[in-house]
Amino acid sequence: ADKFKDKGDFLIFEAFNEIHDGGWGWGANRNDGGKQYKCLNEWNQAFVDAVRASGGENADRILGIPAYCTNVDISLESFVMPEDTANDRLMMSVHCYDPYDYTLAATKNEWGHTADASKKVAGDNEGDLKRVFEKIYVNYISKGIPVYMGEFGCVNRATVREQAFQQYY
């Protein structure tokens, strides 16, 4: 923080990237009584305090605060926005790779209402993704907590047809 304290407000810091125990949100965090969530919330507070204490432009720089694993669903049960000496300068950071079987595992290579049912993830693909954004809005944005999606997307696809679904996603 000290190295960049004199850089303008075009620079935003984010505390961490995808902090988790190796289980990507499906590990010990599920049954440790909230210990990992509490630890990350404490680290986020320490991050805000350290950046603010360095002075200069950092006194009111916008800071990105990640939830556990930057996962929208996990954040609903665990995220605590740190206290801050600057007003309205913290943003929640989330990532979205839903549905996993399409975006990262690539076990399904088509997505959406026009996809071949045997080649897409079951369910209402567009509706399921819309619900992710609704969760973000209802639980954070509507309550005055700004959110940015630091990562969103899916792995590359091999065929022209699969690439068309990737673009649609």
Please give the residue ranges for each predicted region:
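Active-site region of glycoside hydrolase catalytic domains
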Residues: 2-123, 134-154
